[in-house]
Amino acid sequence: MEAKDKLAHRIKHLCKKNHISYYTLSYKSAVPMTTLMHIINCSTKNPGVFTIFKICNGLNITIKDFFDSEEFTDIEYEEY
């Protein structure tokens, strides 16, 4: 699984766990709904650390908490 897929999966999981809709997350994090949906649908290759930071704020978690998951232990890095 690629990093962008893992990001999408983690956001979906945290929204479900916290009973928060994507719309609510978009509002709370000040990330436009279209941007959030591009991340969730994996059409954004690299959402950027600041966007992930804002999403974490919307979820009331730290970036460390976001990435502190089994799914991020074996990320495949792409060379550009």
Question: PLM ranges: what are they?
Answer:
Residues 1-20:
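A short, Lys/Arg-rich alpha-helix, primarily the initiator
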Residues 19-38:
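Short alpha-helical DNA-recognition segment
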Residues 15, 26, 56:
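The alpha-helix within a helix-turn-helix
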Residues 15, 40, 51:
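DNA major-groove recognition helix of helix-turn-helix
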Residues 13, 38, 67-80:
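Short, charged recognition helix plus adjacent turn
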Residues 43-54:
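Short, basic-rich loop-to-helix N-cap that marks the start of a DNA-contacting helix
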Residues 12, 23, 53:
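Residues within the helices of the helix-turn-helix
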Residues 32, 43, 70-74:
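The DNA-recognition helices of helix-turn-helix-type DNA-binding domains
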